[in-house]
Design a protein with these regions (language model features):
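Central hydrophobic cores of alpha-helical transmembrane segments in multi-pass inner-membrane proteins
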Residues: 3-11, 71-89, 108, 159-162
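Long, contiguous internal "core" modules enriched in hydrophobic/ aromatic residues
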Residues: 15-17, 24-44, 133-332, 345
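Core segments of transmembrane alpha-helices
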Residues: 332-340
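Central hydrophobic cores of alpha-helical transmembrane segments
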Residues: 354-364
Length: 383
């Protein structure tokens, strides 16, 4: 990337803004069909009841909440990766920073759908928000679920500002190469950016401020998500390790999702000179670190249960490894901790195919981790 000029990079990126090909519209059509199928399934659930989604007693939190935690983790990791690497002046973050931040904004929107879908009476969702109403009903602000609403709304606001601030020079570059209606749109979006020295000075300070603000905010917000479980009395959930455990898992899954998204786009848009193999290597090395941290969290959970001599806790973790959902537990450990260790070998982390496959495996594993926590945590009765 050091051999590229800024003009060449701009032109490479701008080349992707040409009118889309037929294959693009086919993909859009397929995604639209998928969305319509999902809407039809949701309408069926509203008509019949949420039991069709697998919610039952004792597993009242099913796949909807699994998906919620998974996508919130992806959302938090994008900004966290970009912000932390910016604070540490890691230059290799630049080619993937915008993608990670964009992934964050859209993942928050996806995550927000699942509590809404999970509601039996979705048309009364406004009761979840502190809005004045004639029935004088107010949310319970002591509930972790209300913590979620406030924390994620705050996070969406800050991450969107962080993302948009970083985009300003890019939007101006598109504006300068556009004509007609596109020029007018990007002129508004670029907020008068001209690239003057004074603008760059304010830009770098503002971007640094948002990075410094976003880093602790992301950690605190995902800790709040973990409190949905940790503040309950369910064995396996009621533990103080959940906050760092969830944050580490979010970064782990987010790094894997960056690889999952960047590798196909790198090939499709011919970004090989910008998103170099060295950049992908660094992401893979970081996945090794986060995978070891997640593995440490798995072991620490068992150690805490054993050391506490709490028979119910010990039974919960024994059942996790030997009970009905033991396959999910071992699949989780394999995908999240053991397989990422293959990135230790240079041949593995410099081969595009293995990078992509292992990133998919980590994403599957992180989804199953949430399954093991949410479903496995309440499926075992203690009566």
């Amino acid at each position: 990337m050091s051999q590229l000029t800024y003009a060449k990079i701009d032109q490479t990126i701008l080349d992707t803004l040409t009118p889309p090909k037929k294959s693009y519209w086919i993909l859009v059509f397929l995604l639209l069909v998928g969305a319509l199928i999902g809407a039809a399934c949701w309408a069926y659930q509203i008509a019949v009841g949420i039991g069709v989604g697998g919610q039952n007693n004792p597993v009242a939190w099913g796949t909807y909440l699994i998906n919620f935690v998974f996508w919130v983790g992806i959302a938090h990791s994008g900004t966290l990766i970009s912000a932390i690497l910016h604070l540490f002046r890691a230059g290799w973050r630049n080619p993937i920073a915008r993608a990670a931040e964009t992934m964050t904004v859209f993942a928050v929107c996806v995550a927000g759908l699942f509590p809404f879908i999970h509601l039996g009476r979705a048309w009364q969702v406004y009761y979840m928000f502190p809005l004045p109403n004639q029935r004088l009903l107010w949310p319970n602000f002591l509930s972790p679920l209300m913590f979620d609403v406030i924390a994620i709304s705050t996070y969406l606001t800050v991450s969107s500002l962080f993302w948009y601030t970083g985009l300003l020079p890019d939007l101006a570059a598109v504006r300068d190469k556009s004509t007609g209606t596109r020029y007018k749109i990007f002129k508004i979006l670029s907020l008068g950016w001209t690239g003057a020295h004074e603008q760059w000075r304010h830009y770098t300070r503002g971007y640094l401020f948002f990075a410094a603000l976003a880093t602790p905010l992301v950690i605190s917000v995902h800790s709040v998500v973990s409190w949905d479980f940790a503040l309950g009395i369910v064995p396996g959930w009621h533990t103080t390790i959940f906050a760092p455990y969830f944050v580490a898992g979010a970064i782990h899954s987010g790094l894997a999702m960056v690889l999952t998204l960047m590798i196909p786009l790198r090939k499709l848009f011919k970004y090989e000179d910008i998103i170099t193999i060295e950049v992908l290597q660094n992401v893979a090395k970081t996945i090794v670190l986060t995978g070891l941290i997640v593995g440490l969290a798995y072991g620490t959970e068992y150690f805490i249960a054993w050391y506490s001599h709490n028979t119910i806790e010990m039974e919960q973790f024994r059942w996790r490894a030997l009970g009905d959902y033991r396959w999910g537990f071992y699949f989780m450990v394999l995908c999240n901790t053991l397989i990422p260790l293959l990135f230790v070998f240079k041949k593995v982390r410099t081969t595009i195919a293995t990078l992509f496959i292992i990133s998919l495996i980590v994403n599957f594993g992180m989804w199953w981790e949430r399954f093991v926590i949410i479903v496995g945590g309440v499926a075992h009765g203690f009566a």
